């Protein structure tokens, strides 16, 4: 995204930053002679490496660094595993799709705004992990340019984040022709991507795809993933576990259980996706091959009042908090009806006035979003059209998540002890939500809050250079406020303000640590 091409109104931004880019034209940025790849960081064989351009470009220097894989190796081995090869995927399946963005925040974690050309973190488009994870891997010390030594292969597709052009905006024939739900074209695009990988590289066939990683940020995660990917590792936001699943989105064009046939695909597309769970921490038939539910991206300003960025820990004077879509204008199956039921109970019972039980949209619950989260004891985690990032919101604010989604793993539930810092309520027990929460002893509440303070940093992304610098600035500012307020308060509120390095053991590091544990199982 460091390269922005301006037309009459909006920028066309790339999903990644360029390290050796010579010019930008109406056809897009071009790499310097001798360089290639998605980020122009790869040098053609036999040519000497050139000095990085990053130090000469302040707008780059503040946001990223040269990929270690693009630098002359040191005399002693210092590299850390896992080593990950990032495919320079055919542009049709990734970067070409981004030209169809009609709004700057779509499908990116960062954009450059005109006329000041400032970098703005973007989490309003909730699928931003697609480009974020891609960029993190490109500049990571875990990246390798040598596929022969790779532990894993990352496939940076854009099927999940920007399905509109895949379904009907892009060049004809739209992956087996137009028609049917958008999921059909997305499925066909990923099957074509595997065909392209097989025609271009030998690595998929070498281990049957077990060491290949695919990210699914779509509302219903990998529920619709084509069966050809079953042996691969899936990173997803939606940890639905039930094997006999059906689409529950209220967004009709994304229903993955509605088949469609045409002359280009007379068998329909359901035959290519049936039979696998949406997510499985232990995949049947593929021993050791696992999936992982990972966090959605949240910009630092989203949680600016949280003790996680060293803001003062304050009294938790809000018993329960949720602000967002409560299904007032949705189909009944939205959120499995959970948000609607809790909202109705609270409104009819006058819980806001009686118990400081706050739930509703912006008209019902007003005030600073981060401030309210940082003052709440319990926070609702319920689905939307599929996954919802409310678990991340709760955890990074030190609020105890109240999870009401049956048979669904939340973020990192397969690798962290979520029970130690969260509360689970069965969907059948929604009517008892107030009774259940009121019955939790104060000692248990403080224990869960303390445990949140041990893991909350793993639910935010902080290691990208620009993110790290912004987080440190925010922490410095909040620490000064904390020093001023400390003299006026002797109470100890949990979790205590975070004092560590925001780049250490963040969400990306947690994913890499988990991948390291999976290396033996891909062989």
Tell where the protein language model's regions lie, with residue ranges:
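A Trp-anchored, charged/polar loop motif used as the substrate-binding/catalytic surface
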Residues: 126-144, 195-199, 287-311, 362-365, ...
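Catalytic binding pocket for nucleotide-activated donors in carbohydrate/polymer assembly enzymes
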Residues: 368-460, 473-477, 485-489, 498
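Donor nucleotide-activated moiety binding/catalytic core segment of transferases
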Residues: 308-313, 333, 337-392, 396-400
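N-terminal pre-catalytic "stem/leader" segment of glycosyltransferase-like enzymes
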Residues: 2-8, 43-213, 217-218, 463-471, ...
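Short, solvent-exposed loop/turn segments at secondary-structure junctions
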Residues: 91-93, 158-162, 219-222, 241-242, ...
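Catalytic core of nucleotide-activated saccharide and alditol-phosphate transferases
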Residues: 180-314
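Conserved donor-binding/catalytic core segment of Leloir-type glycosyltransferases
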Residues: 314-328
């Amino acid at each position: 995204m460091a390269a922005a091409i301006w037309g009459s109104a909006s920028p066309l931004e790339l999903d990644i930053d360029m390290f050796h880019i010579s010019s930008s034209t109406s056809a897009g940025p071009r790499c310097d002679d001798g360089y290639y790849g998605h980020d122009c960081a790869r040098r053609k064989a036999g040519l000497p490496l050139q000095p990085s351009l990053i130090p000469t470009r302040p707008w780059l220097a503040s946001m990223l660094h040269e990929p270690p894989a693009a630098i002359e190796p040191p005399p002693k081995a210092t590299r850390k595993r896992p080593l990950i090869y990032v495919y320079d995927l055919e542009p049709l399946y990734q970067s070409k799709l981004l030209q169809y963005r009609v709004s700057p925040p779509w499908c990116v974690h960062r954009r450059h705004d005109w006329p000041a050309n400032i970098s703005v973190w973007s989490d309003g488009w909730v699928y931003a992990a697609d480009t974020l994870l891609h960029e993190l891997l490109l500049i990571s010390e875990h990246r390798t340019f040598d596929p022969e030594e790779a532990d894993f292969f990352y496939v940076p597709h854009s099927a999940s984040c920007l399905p509109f052009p895949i379904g009907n905006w892009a060049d004809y024939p739209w992956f087996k022709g137009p028609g049917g739900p958008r999921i059909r074209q997305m499925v066909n695009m990923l099957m074509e991507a595997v065909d392209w990988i097989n025609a271009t590289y030998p690595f998929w066939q070498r281990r049957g795809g077990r060491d290949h990683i695919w990210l699914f940020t779509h509302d219903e995660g990998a529920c619709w993933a084509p069966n050809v990917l079953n042996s691969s590792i899936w990173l997803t936001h939606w940890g639905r576990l039930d094997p006999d699943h059906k689409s529950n989105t209220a967004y009709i064009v994304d229903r993955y259980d509605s088949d469609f046939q045409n002359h280009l695909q007379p068998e329909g597309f359901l035959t290519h996706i049936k039979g696998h769970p949406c997510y499985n921490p232990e995949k049947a038939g593929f021993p050791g091959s696992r999936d992982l539910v990972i966090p959605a991206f949240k910009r630092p300003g989203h949680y600016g009042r949280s003790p996680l960025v060293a803001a003062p820990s304050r009294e938790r004077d809000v018993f329960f908090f949720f602000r967002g879509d409560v299904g007032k204008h949705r189909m009944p199956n939205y959120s499995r009806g959970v948000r609607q039921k809790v909202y109705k109970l609270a409104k009819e019972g006058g819980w806001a006035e009686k118990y400081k039980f706050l739930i509703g949209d912006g008209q019902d619950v007003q005030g600073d979003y981060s401030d309210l989260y940082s003052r709440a004891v319990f926070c609702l985690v319920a689905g939307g059209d599929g996954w919802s990032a409310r678990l991340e919101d709760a955890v990074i604010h030190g609020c105890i998540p109240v999870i009401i989604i049956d048979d669904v793993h939340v973020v990192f539930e397969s690798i962290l002890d979520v029970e130690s810092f969260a509360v689970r309520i069965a969907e059948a027990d929604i009517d008892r939500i107030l009774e259940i929460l009121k019955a939790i002893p104060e000692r248990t509440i403080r224990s869960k809050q303390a445990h949140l303070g041990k893991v909350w940093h793993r639910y935010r992304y902080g290691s990208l250079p620009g993110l790290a610098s912004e987080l440190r600035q925010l922490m410095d500012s909040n620490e000064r406020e904390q020093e001023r307020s400390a003299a006026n308060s002797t109470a100890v509120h949990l979790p205590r303000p975070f004092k560590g390095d925001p780049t250490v053991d963040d969400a990306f590091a947690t994913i890499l640590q988990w991948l390291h544990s999976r290396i033996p199982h891909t062989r």
